[in-house]
Amino acid sequence: MATDAQMAQVAELEVEMMSDMYRRMTNACQAKCIATAFKESELTKGEAVCLDRCVAKYLDVHEKLGKRLTSMSQGDEAALQKIAQQ
């Protein structure tokens, strides 16, 4: 059973990972979609569409990876329990 300290540590790691993902997504999508020489104070329609697609792809990949890692982790846990029972 997880203690409060362990749960707090897990929550802290989740926040850190989400912050890192957000930072990487922001940097990657900005570099890809927004020109370094600003001509207008607002985003152009093309920039806005590019950012929307970039963020959507980033989040989609993040979700798919999370599901895949969870299933792999559960498979590993089941295998370890099976070995421990033998």
UniProtKB/Swiss-Prot annotation:
Q: Does this entry carry the keyword Disulfide bond?
A: yes
Q: Which organism is it from?
A: Caenorhabditis briggsae
Q: Which SUPFAM superfamilies match?
A: Tim10-like
PANTHER family per the record? MITOCHONDRIAL IMPORT INNER MEMBRANE TRANSLOCASE SUBUNIT TIM10
User: Chief location of this protein?
Assistant: mitochondrion
Q: Does the keyword Transport apply?
A: yes
The disulfides recorded in the entry are 29-54, 33-50
User: Record's family?
Assistant: Belongs to the small Tim family.
* Oligomeric form and interacting partners: Heterohexamer; composed of 3 copies of tim-9/tin-9.1 and 3 copies of tim-10/tin-10, named soluble 70 kDa complex. The complex associates with the tim-22 component of the TIM22 complex. Interacts with multi-pass transmembrane proteins in transit.
**Free-text domain note:** The twin CX3C motif contains 4 conserved Cys residues that form 2 disulfide bonds in the mitochondrial intermembrane space. However, during the transit of tim-10/tin-10 from cytoplasm into mitochondrion, the Cys residues probably coordinate zinc, thereby preventing folding and allowing its transfer across mitochondrial outer membrane.
Q: Which Pfam families does the UniProt entry name for this protein?
A: zf-Tim10_DDP
Cellular location(s): Mitochondrion inner membrane
Q: Where are the transmembrane segments?
A: none
Record keywords, A-Z? Chaperone, Disulfide bond, Membrane, Metal-binding, Mitochondrion, Mitochondrion inner membrane, Protein transport, Translocation, Transport, Zinc
Under the GO molecular function aspect, what terms does this record hold?
A: metal ion binding
Protein's membrane topology: Peripheral membrane protein
Protein's name in the database: Mitochondrial import inner membrane translocase subunit Tim10
Question: Which cellular component terms (GO) are annotated to the entry?
Answer: mitochondrial inner membrane
Could you name the domain of life of the organism this protein comes from? Eukaryota
Gene Ontology BP term (one): protein insertion into mitochondrial inner membrane
Q: Say what the protein does.
A: Mitochondrial intermembrane chaperone that participates in the import and insertion of multi-pass transmembrane proteins into the mitochondrial inner membrane. May also be required for the transfer of beta-barrel precursors from the TOM complex to the sorting and assembly machinery (SAM complex) of the outer membrane. Acts as a chaperone-like protein that protects the hydrophobic precursors from aggregation and guide them through the mitochondrial intermembrane space.
Twin CX3C motif, short sequence motif: residues = 29-54
